[in-house]
């Protein structure tokens, strides 16, 4: 059974989850804020490294036992020129781990709407409303 990593980097906290293919939670931990535009890229990478080590330790696995990971970063994609650097640094931090980076809104919509049509409103440290139509367009 494969182990999968999900990370939600936000303005108030960063949540780490390891689950198995069926979605069963193996481990979960929360660390401090990781918004690269506020806290800086180095802070985000430090929190990612620490959090992944912690959540894998709680799950009783080595980082190399993760099959893939999704890292949701607040503000990711808002400044397109920042994306390649963030992707490169995350890939260097976790060599060999297939990673996808995305905006925290993508993470939220996937979780709440299960990739189906609907509206999702986030009212956290920052606020935003999003929608996804029948055609899958956001």
Annotated model-derived regions:
Residues 1, 96-121:
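Conserved phosphate-binding catalytic cores of ATP/NTP-utilizing and phosphoryl-transfer enzymes
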Residues 3-50, 138:
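Short glycine-rich, Thr/Ser-proximal phosphate-binding strand/loop in the N-terminal lobe
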Residues 12, 75-76, 125-128:
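Short glycine-rich anion-binding loops that position phosphate/pyrophosphate groups of nucleotides
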Residues 17, 70-72, 100, 120-122:
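Short, conserved beta-strand segments within well-ordered enzyme catalytic domains
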Residues 19-21, 111-115, 135:
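Alpha-helix C-terminal capping segments
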Residues 55-93, 112-113:
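Short beta-strand-loop/turn "lid" adjacent to the catalytic site in phosphate-handling enzymes
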Residues 78-79, 107-109, 128-129:
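Short, active-site-adjacent cap segments at secondary-structure transitions
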Residues 115-138:
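Glycine-rich phosphate-binding loop of actin/hexokinase-like ATP-binding domains
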């Amino acid at each position: 059974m494969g182990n999968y990593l999900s990370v939600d980097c936000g303005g108030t906290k960063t949540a780490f989850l390891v689950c198995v293919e069926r979605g069963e939670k193996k481990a979960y931990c929360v660390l401090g804020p990781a918004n690269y535009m506020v806290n800086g890229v180095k802070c985000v990478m430090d929190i990612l490294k620490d959090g992944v080590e912690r959540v894998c330790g709680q799950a009783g696995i080595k980082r190399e036992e993760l099959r893939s990971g999704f890292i949701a970063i607040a503000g990711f994609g808002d400044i397109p020129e920042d994306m390649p650097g963030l992707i490169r640094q995350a890939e260097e931090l976790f060599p060999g781990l297939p990673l996808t980076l995305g905006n925290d809104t993508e993470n939220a919509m996937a979780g709440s709407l299960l990739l189906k049509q609907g509206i999702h409103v986030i009212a956290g440290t920052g606020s935003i409303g999003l929608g996804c139509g029948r055609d899958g367009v956001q």
